[in-house]
Amino acid sequence: MLDKIKQMMSKGTSSNTFSYSQLSSFKNCPQQYKIIYLDGVRKSSESIEAFMGKRVHEVLEWLYSEENRVKPYITFDGLCQTFDNLWVEHWHKEIHIADTRKNSDFYYSIGKRCLSNYYSRYGPTFDQRVEDTEVDLKFTIGEHNFRGIIDRLDQPEPGKWIVHDYKTSKRPKTERQAMNDIQLALYQIAVEQNFGQVDEISLTWHFLRIGSEVTVLHTRDELEKLRKKLIKSADKINNCLGNEINFLPKESILCHWCYLWEECTAKVGPNPVKRAD
């Protein structure tokens, strides 16, 4: 597989479309990147944190659906009912809990807290000028193809855009960390390439567990530095192709949330974390 990809690249065609998830996976563990994105291994196993986060994202996507945007208000009970329905609908037997002190009820309550914090801030009218949710964009950075999915994109006035990203993790970013974050910088570049009039783009992180937000606006120089950082990350991955030694495992605490132990050369047997009840 690696040799085939390397041969395609040597002919001047890139077989790879990068995403933030891919760049993050390679940085955290090159072997995880290889197993998922080169070998094509996909599993139904997921962490309870990831499951909860997906359901919260789906509720907020539903909240800003075209049907709901024309309503004068949305009740919190409506949000909770949607969350409950999605939780039950998508629950499966391969959800795992790394922290054995916690159970599924604990993470369910965190999901409800995330929605409560968001509702308290923006409800019940939710009258933001939403362009779309789950915006799937393709774009290029340097010689690399990229794809990004934006949680929500607003256009409060012509030429002015706001990229929104929902986070259900427990650690919020500082403004300085947000300024150096490549994920939303990636999305800013995507918006600039895919929409006509773009005069200003602000990037907003919603840290739903604690109900806080961070918003940044990049200067052209700041964005250019992040663009070069993205190119460097993509170049590094491409330069590794064709040599197995470049995709060694990187063991860390993140291994507890990885379900590729049976494929990983650093592990023996499946991940021993418990299944959620």
Where are each of the predicted segments found?
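Metal-dependent nuclease catalytic regions and adjoining charged, substrate-binding loops involved
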Residues: 1, 17, 77, 158, ...
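Long, acidic, intrinsically disordered low-complexity segments
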Residues: 1-18, 136
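Nuclease catalytic cores
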Residues: 23-24, 28-68, 108, 112, ...
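Short, compositionally biased low-complexity segments
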Residues: 27-34, 54-57, 74-95, 198-208
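Short amphipathic alpha-helical segments and their helix-coil junctions
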Residues: 30-43, 90-95, 163, 169, ...
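Hydrophobic (often cysteine-bearing) scaffold residues that line and stabilize catalytic clefts
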Residues: 48, 52, 107, 180-183, ...
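A non-catalytic, helix-rich entry segment at domain boundaries
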Residues: 59-133
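Mg2+/Mn2+-dependent nuclease catalytic core
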Residues: 128-130, 135-228, 232
